[in-house]
From Swiss-Prot:
Optimum pH is 6.75-7.25. Gene3D superfamilies: Farnesyl Diphosphate Synthase, Terpene synthase, N-terminal domain. This is Beta-farnesene synthase. Mg(2+) 3 binds at residue 452. Involved in the production of (E)-beta-farnesene, an aphid alarm pheromone. Can use both farnesyl diphosphate and geranyl diphosphate as substrate, but not geranylgeranyl diphosphate. Produces mainly (E)-beta-farnesene, but also smaller amounts of (Z)-beta-farnesene and gamma-cadinene when used with farnesyl diphosphate as substrate. In the presence of geranyl diphosphate, produces limonene, terpinolene and the acyclic monoterpene myrcene along with minor amounts of gamma-terpinene, (Z)-ocimene, (E)-ocimene and sabinene. It holds the Pfam family Terpene_synth. It catalyses: (2E,6E)-farnesyl diphosphate = (E)-beta-farnesene + diphosphate. The Asp-Asp-Xaa-Xaa-Asp/Glu (DDXXD/E) motif is important for the catalytic activity, presumably through binding to Mg(2+). InterPro entries: Isoprenoid_synthase_dom_sf, Terpene_cyclase-like_1_C, Terpene_cyclase_plant_C1, Terpene_synth_N, Terpene_synth_N_sf, Terpene_synthase-like, Terpene_synthase_metal-bd, Terpenoid_cyclase/PrenylTrfase. Binds 3 Mg(2+) or Mn(2+) ions per subunit.
Length: 550
């Protein structure tokens, strides 16, 4: 017994094997950017003029099909935020319209748009395309545009809607085997992207940047919408680069890449998450705040997971729980830096929240950081002491280590619709929050190169699942892919259900976008976009480097 106690005592002083993270590939790429106010003003004036014409076009659309295709195009081009009132008005008309005469393309488009706009619509609308054997009619297999529309619609389904799972299988099979050479370029490119990233799960502004390039080559394009989308993206890209410049300079003042060499230097990648949450111009605080929230999460994760001993981790958790600057003196030097970094961000946050009428958010932000520390500490003990908890215990802890609560808290001052009641709702751990949290964890654990090696052993949810259910690694990975699919269905259902809880669309979209970013950030073959800069590179280049060509 005494020997066992000595072993445990020694173990608590052992540092985990340190992962050497790749350096930032961006260094000072964005820190010296200077916004041209005159150029922005010119863009703004052009946007306003073109918006008036586009608004007239939208309001002049009379048939449901005209309305739906135009709304879909505006959303794909990243322009819908300019026309929210008009689009919601048209969505109500579409919802009220009879759909008996709609073909597969129109039926599926209507279904998807209504659900994405939080309207209750039954999947029974697809019954007319089912044969006597309960399968989709094979005659549909030659209709590529209809198949694509059904494929996209099927990804807004719920768990209980078996017809939509059948739709995914049916459409994917036929789209993957389709001869697309004779199809219009726009259809070919849409199919290619959808099979990689279904539209409902795609990174909205990254998709918009891609779609502008595709739309430009389409013979049926509308020149007005093309020009508006280009000027709009140019305006937003300049805004993003200005925000990223400010953020980079702030980050450099901390010099954490030298002071905390075990931690990932990822300010640009953190800002990508901010753009993913809300890309629209009015959400500048959200993007900047989210980036700082991500950096807190990343540094805490690396401190617990990549450097701290168990004793140091326990001490840090206790000190953070007291939330007192004077307590920093109890910490090792490197932890003092981490602690002061967190408190500095919080103090600025507290001031911002007060200015923006969101003082009630500050205690919640503090609470989520403490909660995150406790969850990271628990996870590190499992890893270092080689304790495999039950899969359910791991999942419960993972809801916290997903960082979703700290991330959401970090942006509250920039969300007009958030109230104390919103925070109370989130603290009740609603399904929308827990499901989006688990999307990130499931992708984390199924991403092959993301599985963290500890002294030659791997410890992730896959390990817990393999042990508890006697599965091979491949079987566990397949099970997790299934969990991702089922969890998305829960998100889809709760996204609509929030309209019954007095939770605004702005908040529901925020959680939905978290899941979308997770989907875009993890790869089964290349790892994750925060740990490996090469995975995030394409998105960074598309959003902040490559200029729109007019």
């Amino acid at each position: 017994m005494a020997t066992n106690g000595v072993v445990i005592s020694c173990l608590r002083e052992v540092r985990p094997p340190m992962t050497k993270h790749a350096p930032s590939m961006w260094t000072d790429t964005f820190s010296n950017f200077s916004l041209d106010d005159k150029e922005q003003q010119k863009c703004s004036e052009t946007i306003e003029a073109l918006k008036q014409e586009a608004r007239g076009m939208l309001m002049a659309a009379t048939t449901p099909l005209q309305q739906m295709t135009l709304i879909d195009t505006l959303e794909r081009l990243g322009l819908s935020f300019h026309f929210e009132t008009e689009i919601e008005y048209k969505i109500e008309l579409i919802n009220a319209a009879e759909d008996d005469g709609f073909d597969l393309f129109a039926t599926a488009l209507r279904f998807r748009l209504l659900r994405q706009h939080q309207r209750h619509v039954s999947c029974d609308v697809f019954d007319k395309f089912i044969d006597k054997d309960g399968k989709f009619e094979e005659s549909l297999s030659n209709n590529v545009e209809g198949l694509l529309s059904l494929y996209e619609a099927a990804h807004v389904g719920f768990r209980e809607e078996r017809i939509l799972q059948e739709a995914v299988n049916f459409t994917r099979h036929h789209l993957e085997g389709a001869e697309l050479d004779q199809s219009p370029l726009l259809i070919r490119e849409k199919v290619k992207r959808a099979l990689e990233h279904p539209l409902h799960r795609d990174f909205p502004i990254v998709y918009a940047r891609l779609f502008i390039s595709i739309y430009e080559k389409d013979d049926s394009r509308d020149e007005l919408l093309l020009k508006l989308s280009k000027v709009n993206f140019k305006f937003m890209q300049n805004l993003y680069k200005e925000e990223l410049s400010q953020l980079s300079r702030w980050w450099n003042t901390w010099n954490l890449k030298s002071k905390l060499p075990y931690a990932r230097d990822r300010v640009v990648e953190a800002y990508v998450w901010g753009v993913g949450y809300h890309y629209e111009p009015q959400y500048s605080y959200v993007r900047m705040g989210l980036a700082k929230g991500v950096l807190i999460c990343g540094i805490m994760d690396d401190t617990y997971d990549n450097y701290a001993t168990l004793n140091e981790a326990q001490l840090f958790t206790q000190v953070l729980d007291k939330w007192d600057r004077d307590e920093a003196e109890r910490l090792p030097e490197y932890m003092k830096i981490v602690y002061r970094f967190i408190l500095s961000i919080y103090e600025n946050y507290e001031r911002d929240a007060a200015k923006l009428g969101k003082s009630f958010a500050a205690p919640y932000f503090k609470e989520t950081v403490k909660q995150l520390a406790r969850a990271f500490n628990e996870e590190q003990k499992w890893v270092m002491e080689r304790q495999l908890p039950s899969f359910q215990d791991y999942v419960k802890n993972s809801e916290k280590t997903s960082c979703i609560y700290t991330m959401f808290a970090s942006i509250i001052p920039g969300l007009k619709s958030v109230t104390q009641e919103t925070i109370d709702w989130i603290k009740s751990e609603p399904t929308l929050a827990t499901s989006t949290a688990m999307i990130g964890r499931y992708w984390n654990d199924t991403s092959s190169q993301l599985r963290e090696s500890k002294g030659g052993e791997m410890l992730t949810a896959l390990d817990f699942h393999m042990k508890e259910y006697g599965l091979t690694k491949e079987e566990a990975a397949s099970k997790f892919e299934g969990l991702v699919e089922e969890t998305w269905k829960d998100i889809n259902k709760e996204f609509i259900a929030t309209t019954n809880y007095n939770v605004g669309r702005e908040i529901a979209i925020t959680f939905l976008n978290y899941a979308r970013i997770c989907e875009a950030s993890y790869s089964k073959t290349d790892g994750d976009a925060y740990s490996d800069p090469n995975v995030a590179k394409a998105n960074v280049v598309a959003l902040f480097v490559d200029a729109i060509v007019f």
